[in-house]
A protein has these predicted regions:
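Beta-rich ligand-binding surfaces for carbohydrates and other polyanions
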Residues: 1-319
Length: 319
C-alpha cells in the first residue's frame, strides 16, 4: 500500500446508512468521497439515482445484471433508455431489446398497468437537458421494497414479508412469454391466455405459414391488402380498434388533441396506426408494429389502419 492510500484511509470515515448506502466521508463528515449509490450494480434502492441520455446509449449510472445467481461480475442484461420520441425503459441483452416498459405518462409506464397500484408507485423522472434522472421513493413508508435486475433478465419488485421475515417477489417484468420483446414479430399481438399466444392482426397473415404453425413467430405477419391512401377512385382507409393493448415500440409523438389524432394519421400515407393516451398525447406509428400485447387491466386503445375492403360495412373508428 503506498503512502497516498494510507493517507486516504486515515483521513476518511466509512458509514453504512439506514438507506443501504455505503458512504466514504472525509474525517469531518462534511464531504462525500465515494458512495455505493453511484454504483448500483443490479439493484435499485430508494434514493439511488440512475442517469440516462435521451439521445444516445451514453448511460451514466445504470443497472447491470449479475453473470449468474452466484457470480456478481457483469452479466448479459442491463437497464437502458434507448433513443425514442417518448421516454420508456428497456432491458437489453447486448444491444437487443429483451423487455420494454412502454411510454411514461408522468405517472406510470403504459406497458406496466400494475404500476397504478400504491405498492409500485413512487417513481420520479427528472429531465435535465439531454439527460434523464430516474429515482423512486417509498410511497408508503410501512411497505419496504426494492428492485433487482436478475441474471436471467427479469426486472423484479421485492417486498418485505413480515410474516415470513423475508423478501418476496411481488412483481416481475417477464411473467409470460408475451412479455419478451417482439415475441410474436411484426403486426401480431401476444395474448398469454390464448393458445397459441400469437395471433396476426385482422387484415394480416403469417409471413411464413410453416414457421408460424411450428411456433416460430419471429417473422410476424404481412398485410393482405395494400392501403389505399391517395389511390384515385378508392375508398378511404379505415381503422380497426384494439382495446387494452400495450402500445407498439417506436411511437412517434405529435402535437394533436384526441379528436384530431386520427385525422393526423389519415393525412399521412405512411401512418400505420395511432393511439391517444392521457399524459402522453397523440402517438403515431410509421414503421412495422412490434411488441403488441393484450392486457386485461388498463392498457391503451390502438387503432390499426386497414384498407377499406378489410372492414366492409364498418364505419371509420372514432378517434
Amino acid at each position: 500500500m503506498n503512502r497516498r492510500c494510507i493517507l486516504l484511509i486515515s483521513s476518511s470515515v466509512a458509514q453504512l446508512q439506514n438507506t443501504g448506502n455505503l458512504v466514504l466521508l472525509t474525517d469531518d463528515s462534511n464531504s462525500v468521497i465515494w458512495q455505493s449509490f453511484d454504483y448500483p450494480t443490479d439493484s435499485l434502492l430508494p434514493g439511488v439515482k440512475l442517469t440516462y441520455s435521451k439521445n444516445s446509449n451514453d448511460n451514466k449510472t445504470v443497472i447491470n445484471s449479475w453473470k449468474s445467481s452466484t457470480d456478481p461480475s457483469t452479466g448479459r442484461f442491463r437497464m437502458a433508455s434507448l433513443p425514442r420520441d417518448l421516454l420508456e425503459f428497456f432491458i437489453v441483452e447486448g444491444d437487443k431489446p429483451y423487455w420494454r416498459s412502454g411510454p411514461w405518462n408522468g405517472y406510470l409506464f403504459l406497458g406496466i398497468p400494475v404500476f397504478k397500484s400504491e405498492t409500485v408507485s413512487g417513481f420520479n423522472i427528472d429531465d435535465h437537458n439531454d439527460m434523464l434522472e430516474v429515482s423512486y421513493e417509498l410511497a408508503n413508508q410501512s411497505v419496504f421494497k426494492w428492485y433487482k435486475l436478475t441474471y436471467d433478465g427479469r426486472w423484479t419488485q421485492n417486498l418485505w414479508n413480515n410474516s415470513r421475515n423475508d423478501w418476496a417477489i411481488s412483481w416481475q417484468s417477464i411473467a409470460s412469454d408475451c412479455d419478451v420483446y417482439g415475441n410474436c414479430g411484426k403486426f401480431a399481438v401476444c395474448n398469454p391466455r390464448k393458445k397459441p399466444i400469437c395471433e396476426c392482426l385482422k387484415g394480416f397473415n403469417p409471413e411464413n405459414i410453416d414457421e408460424w404453425r411450428n411456433g416460430n413467430w419471429t417473422n410476424g405477419c404481412v398485410r393482405r391488402t395494400d392501403l389505399q391512401c391517395r389511390v384515385p377512385g378508392n375508398k378511404e382507409d379505415k381503422f380497426l380498434q384494439l382495446k387494452q393493448i400495450k402500445v407498439p415500440d417506436y411511437a412517434h409523438w405529435i402535437q394533436a388533441n384526441e379528436d384530431n389524432c386520427q385525422t393526423k394519421c389519415l393525412e399521412n400515407c405512411s401512418c400505420l396506426a395511432y393511439s391517444y393516451y392521457d399524459g402522453v398525447g397523440c402517438m403515431l406509428w410509421n414503421v412495422n408494429l412490434i411488441d403488441l400485447q393484450q392486457f386485461f387491466v388498463d392498457g391503451a386503445d390502438v387503432f390499426i389502419r386497414l384498407a377499406n375492403s378489410e372492414l366492409p360495412g364498418e364505419p371509420v373508428a372514432d378517434g
